[in-house]
Amino acid sequence: MTGKPAIDVISFGCRLNTFEAEIMKREAAAAGLGAADAVPAVIINTCAVTGEAVRQARQAVRRARRDNPSARIIVTGCAAQTEGETFARMDEVDAVIGNDDKLKADSYRSLPDFGVSAEEKVRINDIMSVRETAGHMVDAIEGRARAIVQVQNGCDHRCTFCIIPFGRGNSRSVPMGAAVAQVRRLVDAGYREVVLSGVDMTSWGADLPGAPRLGTLVQAILRHVPDLPRLRLSSIDSIEADPALLDAIGTEMRLMPHLHLSLQAGDNMILKRMKRRHSREDAIAFCVDMRSRRPDIVYGADIIAGFPTETDAMFENSLRLVEECGLTHLHVFPFSPRKGTPAARMPQMPKAVGKERAALLRARGEAAHAAHLARLVGTRQRILVEREGLGRAEDFTLADITVGAPGEIVEAEIIGQTGERLVTRPLMAAAA
């Protein structure tokens, strides 16, 4: 025995879950879970975005029990919060902990005994009653060259397809000082790139005194942590982007030229039925405007295929959005009805139609991505080495890289492409 707590955290879904996994492991260890003289523990940190995500979590639970017959198996995350009984009924599960409690050591100190009833396994509070999100400090993100900082949690919007507000609660912001201090701490630990993350990140600040906006936070981080080479945003809602954020994207070269947009669809009627806050014209205008400010900017987007009532013509509008917005990195999901959401009660499309349309969207996205890679051939790019042989350019494109240690930034010439990656010829280690 090495004395290191035997705790394995398996995370599904978003970057926020990845960040929270580090906190959960630390808090569970502080509570004595998985100690050298105790049984090992496996924590499954679930996602609730789609039915497939829940299925994969259940599969992970069964696999964890097969691989670790004597371990304590704990299920938490968004799917645990929204449908805890689903996991509590599984014989393999020892405890189900809600999204708020999973970040507290006390939640792991008094776990239920083996073999208790499903009701006794569940430790879930009312997520809607949570009013604050602590600025949790982490010194490292295990196995990653870039660090993630949570600045916001929850969502005040109620899109008709989305279960996440019921898994994460209403929007809460990490205070600016705590967020800046966390970035400072990670840069001091050697990280060259920090990713700001949240559930609805462009709503950051609305619940804080004075209601500051996300752009103010971004500018504060860049100002107070001048030795941070790369700051990246995760997903944003373009209709909520404030003027200070737009200015920062256009002028701050340390803010990476990659935006992942929560678009969801390209047809106005479908957007209305989704209860989104933007139109297709809004999305296109935003992308055109940002590209005029920052010509090297690259867009990713979430798009749902086969939403209830989506006709062929409506779907074509989503397909055309790839070109009209200049999208490069697509996250495509066939519509998945989530119990309790308004969209689950709408007239449903056949699953085969959703899968077929998702495949068409992915193919359109892959073609756009290949064209983007081809345009980069002959340019110079700064590559953050993620692991041996692989890194990412500033626009989040994967690149083969033959030199540099994980976490090092290397300047390289792009000499070709292979699959979804750039082929590079290293020139030198880049200065911060």
Please provide the spans of the model-predicted regions:
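Conserved SAM/AdoMet-binding glycine-rich loop
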Residues: 73-77, 82-83, 188-312
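Terminal RNA-binding accessory module
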Residues: 337, 345-432
